[in-house]
A protein has these predicted regions:
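Proprotein-processing/basic-patch segments
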Residues: 23-28, 199-309, 322, 352-355
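C-terminal motif of bacterial Sec signal peptides marking the signal peptidase cleavage site
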Residues: 17-19
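Extended extracellular/luminal ectodomain segments enriched in beta-structured repeat modules
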Residues: 108-113, 342-349
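Sec-dependent N-terminal signal peptides
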Residues: 7-13
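Bacterial N-terminal signal peptides that target proteins for export
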Residues: 1-7
Length: 367
């Protein structure tokens, strides 16, 4: 009885030991015929790479780039952009308040101020680097050229340009307090937006346009009419500083108005209650974005590269990649050799390969 009991105990332990394996990786393999067996192998082929200079790329984007950055290997990289300003369909300026009809809102039929605001949210490089930005008015309509080798000189006269303004700036504006920078509206959205602002002549870009809209309302019928007859766009570039490139989200042309504070129930201006100003009509000032760069209008970026990339591309010891426009790496694969060797094989997986500073002649096994 003891021997039988001991034998049963050993058998149970053995079954328990071999029965605890939960690996199902080979489950069912034994049921397959021998001809269905899968064998894995790797092979290698010689790959030749070379650098190709790319002077431009197609860039259909609503982001503008402005600034300059110098790299010790690739040399300098300079970015600027040109953009039209969108005019909403059947645009109309605010009207002067009519006390008889109780319509309109402005205190006078004038524009109190005009400014061009370049908004950005991110940048590349040194946030405290001193830079200077210039804005020029375009004198010729932009073509639908989305390539980064666009020549701005075709659209404004470099010898006799219309300069809208110059402003010194740093990407991170240290004059803005933390309270301003972190302020939010009633919905929790931040109200501060980094920007570079150019003050424009209110007569040329404000009151003249206001008068023109009354004489030729068809000029403000849509963006096409506005660009053809009123304002063709702006060219934004950096002409001082090295080490910072701004990623511009949009460009706004804003106008300042003085208006009456109207009681919405009666459509009559509120009366002031301050001592010395009793019973005077209550007024205020506001800035409004009237025209802006949007996806509906043309925006084109120009990227300029140092001549250093020509020397790097000619080097035969390495290949390089410099984007978005600069140097591409071209890899020549031995297609015929691959086809002949793998014609009867099934490729279940191909491991992707990335190239960075490769030697001109390498095999996949070296990567």
């Amino acid at each position: 009885m003891k021997v039988k009991f001991l034998g049963a105990l050993l058998l149970t332990a053995t079954l328990t030991f071999f029965g605890c394996d939960d690996n199902t990786g080979t489950l069912g393999i034994g049921m397959l015929p021998g001809s269905d067996g899968i064998s894995a192998l790797t092979t290698e082929f010689p790959v030749t790479t070379r650098s190709v200079v790319a002077d431009s790329v197609f860039a259909k984007t609503s982001t503008g780039y402005v600034g300059r950055f110098t790299d010790p290997l690739f040399g300098y990289y300079e970015a600027s952009f040109l953009t039209e300003l969108n005019c909403i369909d059947n645009f109309k300026f605010p009207e002067k308040y009519d006390f008889d009809k109780k319509t309109g809102i402005l205190t006078e039929d004038t524009v109190a101020g005009v400014r061009l605001v370049v908004f950005y949210s991110t940048w590349f490089g040194d946030s405290l680097n001193a830079c200077r930005m210039s804005a020029y008015q375009l004198q010729k309509e932009l073509e639908r050229n989305r390539y980064t080798n666009i020549d701005p000189a075709k659209y404004y006269d470099k010898l006799n340009p219309i300069l809208l303004g110059r402003r010194a700036y740093t990407a991170y504006d240290t004059s803005v307090t933390d309270e301003e920078r972190n302020a939010t509206d009633s919905y929790g959205n931040k109200t501060y937006y980094p920007s570079v602002t150019f003050t424009l002549d209110k007569e040329t870009y404000g009151n003249k346009w206001l008068k023109l809209s009354k004489e030729h309302p068809e000029y403000f019928k849509n963006s096409k009419a506005f660009i053809e007859n009123v304002f063709k766009g702006v060219y934004i570039k950096s002409d001082y500083g090295d080490g910072t490139v701004l990623y511009v989200d949009r460009v706004d042309l804003q106008m300042k108005y003085q208006f009456y504070v109207i009681d919405t129930a009666t459509n009559v201006p509120y009366k002031r209650k301050q001592a010395g100003f009793e019973n005077e009509d209550s007024t205020a000032h506001t800035w409004r974005t009237e025209f802006a760069s949007t996806k509906e209008v043309i925006q084109a970026n120009q990227f300029l590269n140092s001549d250093k990339i020509q020397k790097l591309a000619a080097e035969d010891e390495h290949t390089y990649i410099k984007s978005p426009a600069g140097i591409f790496t071209e890899a020549e694969l031995p297609y015929d050799d691959i086809y002949q060797k793998l014609a009867n094989d099934t490729l279940n997986a191909v491991k992707p390969v990335s190239y960075t500073h490769l030697r001109a002649h390498e095999t996949l096994s070296d990567l």
